Swiss-Prot record:
Source taxonomy: Archaea, Methanobacteriati, Methanobacteriota, Stenosarchaea group, Halobacteria
The organism of origin for this protein: Haloarcula marismortui (strain ATCC 43049 / DSM 3752 / JCM 8966 / VKM B-1809)
InterPro entries: Alpha/beta_knot_MTases, NA-bd_OB-fold, Put_MeTrfase-C9orf114-like, tRNA_m1G_MTases_N
Name of the protein described by the UniProt record: Uncharacterized protein rrnAC1612
Pfam families: Methyltrn_RNA_3
CDD domains for this protein: HsC9orf114-like (cd18086)
Length: 281
């Protein structure tokens, strides 16, 4: 089952400075990690662009999703990453559930060199890059991210494995393209104008999500909710969309009914929505 989250490129538009913008994006990445999101998609919102350069949101989120031991190798120094020190740690669990220091744990690495002898050098957070044989059924290239199973650190015993990397992927795509993916599942728009979520409705949502093989949940930006971004009248959205609506969602939901604040920030909406929508029966 695939869980995808869509956020706009204008996500940090109201932040006063780059530090605050980076901190805000860190909370978004943290929500994606906590709720085991598989894919975090940044969709364009040119009309809501703020003071930050094009690509800033995607770059910071990609950096946050990169395992700490690979960040220097993959990113170096970039202006957009000036304040990444304020990002919260994600502490993404490995696919095995083992800690990164445990025997038999899975670690992500980056291929730094491909040899002619069927071996590669991989930086996977050990003291030095390690040389590993490439399994016959694998084809890897320099710069590629790979999964390494470490069975011992002293002496080093490790091997490349054909396993999915942990954490979530960050991609950029148009909203229409993201909603029309084969693995999009149940498509949900999070909006204060949507149908209020109730305890009775949650069971129905979980059943429908599982039947669809996952879900895609979209969010708006500060002072620019999804109706504004999509140029849709707020009173035109509701719960189930029974016809071919231009917005392309199966459901419009309000996961913070009776909100006590005039504005629910996007990062707050992520936690509120994913808490409800990832519940199981």
């Amino acid at each position: 089952m695939t869980t995808s989250v869509l956020v706009p490129s204008s996500l940090a538009r109201e932040a006063e400075d780059r530090r605050e913008a980076t901190r805000k994006l860190g909370y978004v990445a943290r929500a994606a990690a906590v709720y085991r999101v598989d894919r975090l998609t940044v969709y364009p919102d040119p009309d809501g662009a703020g003071k930050w350069e094009d690509g800033f949101v995607e770059t910071v989120l990609r950096y946050a999703a990169t395992p700490p031991h690979l960040r220097k190798e993959m990113w170096g120094k970039r202006d957009e990453l000036e304040y990444v020190g304020v990002l919260p740690p994600l502490r993404v669990r490995s696919q095995t559930g083992s800690g990164s220091e445990g025997s038999g744990s899975l670690r992500q690495g980056i291929v730094t060199e491909v040899g002619a002898d069927g071996r590669v050098r991989v930086n996977c957070g050990m003291q030095h890059p390690i040389s590993l044989p490439v399994p016959a059924d694998m084809d890897v290239e320099q710069g590629e991210r790979v999964t390494v199973r470490v069975s011992s650190r002293r002496p080093v015993r490790a091997k490349l494995v054909d396993a999915p990397t942990t954490g979530f992927d960050v991609v950029a795509a148009d909203l229409d393209a993201a909603l029309s993916r084969d693995d999009a599942g149940l498509t949900i728009a999070s909006s204060r104008y949507g149908e209020p979520v109730t305890s009775t409705r949650l069971g129905q949502l979980a059943e429908r999500r599982d039947a669809e093989g996952g879900m895609t949940v979209a969010f708006g930006a500060p002072e620019r909710g999804l109706p504004s971004i999509l140029d849709v009248a707020p009173d035109a959205v509701g719960g189930d969309q029974t016809s071919d609506e231009p917005e392309g969602f199966d459901l419009w939901l309000n996961t913070v009914p009776n909100q006590g604040s005039e504005v629910v920030r996007t990062e707050e909406a992520l936690f509120a929505s994913l808490t409800c929508l990832t519940l199981t029966e």
